[in-house]
């Protein structure tokens, strides 16, 4: 079965915490992530500007790790379509072109105004902010999303983040509604832990 696909614009891949969350949900098979070599180039350039303290190698390694983890994410062969697309900002046409070729269901971007619905409608592509996209994922698969967030918090280092602190960081990355809603769903993790503990006890007791 073909998975739901989302083209990730460079602006949602630059914030490290947000990008990590988006990719962890993809790793959990909640959707198929898409990008292009040009989007990655824009991401690398933007990260250098936002985080000048990071070395070029570290930034490039992050991009290479994304491609390695999601081997089918990078869309190719979109260049011929770029000049057919008409957008308020011509520099964004490559994103739509890659989304069309990659058969994306939607584009996740913080700049939704740059992608008019009437331009995307003929290609059956929607546009969503990362806040709306993550809220939808939480609604569709609440436990999977909360589990991914919990793993993300636990894997953080220097300092290690609590789940609440992680969600606070995400709120500053343009996903305030998602962060606020996710905080109300933490009970799912406790319920899952309790259920797993009960099952483990029964298995241990031979029940």
Where are these regions (language model features)?
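Acidic, PIN/NYN-like endoribonuclease modules and their adjacent C-terminal/linker elements
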Residues: 113-203
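Short, flexible loop segments at the rims of nucleotide/cofactor-binding pockets, characterized by
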Residues: 82-88
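PIN/NYN-family metal-dependent endoribonuclease catalytic core
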Residues: 5-8, 16-52
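Acidic, metal-binding active-site segment of PIN/NYN-like and related structure-specific nucleases
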Residues: 92-125
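PIN-domain endoribonuclease scaffold, especially VapC-family toxins
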Residues: 34-78, 146, 152-177
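A generic structural signal for alpha->beta connector loops
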Residues: 30, 71-72, 124
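Amphipathic coiled-coil/heptad-repeat helices and related helical stalk/stem segments
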Residues: 18, 91-92
